[in-house]
From Swiss-Prot:
Similarity field: Belongs to the GrpE family.
Organism of this sequence: Arabidopsis thaliana (Mouse-ear cress)
Protein name: GrpE protein homolog 2, mitochondrial
Keyword Metal-binding found: yes
Function: Essential component of the PAM complex, a complex required for the translocation of transit peptide-containing proteins from the inner membrane into the mitochondrial matrix in an ATP-dependent manner. Seems to control the nucleotide-dependent binding of mitochondrial HSP70 to substrate proteins. Binds ATP. Interacts with copper ions Cu(2+). Confers thermotolerance to long-term exposure at moderately high temperature (TMHT at 35 degrees Celsius).
GO CC term, one of those recorded: mitochondrial matrix
Keywords: ATP-binding, Chaperone, Copper, Metal-binding, Mitochondrion, Nucleotide-binding, Stress response, Transit peptide
Amino acid sequence: MLVLRILSRVTRNAGIRSSLSAVTLPARNQTPVFSSRFHSLAHDFSHKLVPAQMSMMDSFALQRFNFSSSTSPESDEKKTHTEASKTSEEKPTAEANQPGLDSESKDSVTDSAKRKRKGAKGAASSSSESDSESDDDELSADDLVKLVAEKEELLSEKEEEIKQLKDKVLRTYAEMENVMDRTRRDAENTKKYAVQNFAKSLLDVADNLGRASSVVKESFSKLDTSEDSAGAAPLLKTLLEGVEMTEKQLAEVFKKFGMEKYDPINEPFDPNRHNAVFQVPDASKPEGTVAHVLKSGYTLYDRVIRPAEVGVTQGGENQEEKKESDA
């Protein structure tokens, strides 16, 4: 019974307070929008406050008369927090649903917020532009001149470096061409003169065949066939034919591989092609003429592999002309 009396008193006090607030609020000189808003807030607050007061009184009464409750103070605090959050969430909805606030006021609020955002963005962009302009203004004319001079100097250095590299490339290319030509020429010469040493070793064989052929011819010419009782003439003739055939075949092989024999009789002496072994006094020929050949010379293509061994005239027509000119 005591609990019911306390609860009835609390509800009566809350009703009186709400009626007083409703009576006193219109007396103030305010706009209808703000008065209605405040009235709704007060009404909501009174409705939220009454259950909270009742819950507090219930807990007080139960503690006064030693009654235990299943709810703890922590749960009461949680309830108060949740109720406060609900009231805070219901305030904007109540304000939006009030008849005093129309759509135009809402649009004005949103427009003002947008203008503030645009103003903030414009201020940020203007500040960045001013910073960039200040950075540009920091470079004076002298600094620009120095910067241009440095760039021109760097450009000239790069151009000189490019020029040197071009010259180096041209020199390298020319050297490479020379190396390629020299390599090609060496390869051709190696192939061309590969048989030089082998052919040079066969020159003595060719000389001996020539000497044998000349001796057999001389012996065969001196032989008297009428007094030849042993039959040596046919044998010498067969030997001569065999030697001559062998000599001819060897000469053909030499010619096939680029070797040629030359006999410089009655030619002017040439130290590149002739090797003077002795001198022959002969007034009928000009001085320095090849009068006698001991060994024939051989060439492999355009290269002399063995110069001819010759005898050169001495005291010929040139010496007589000198004597006449002196007289």
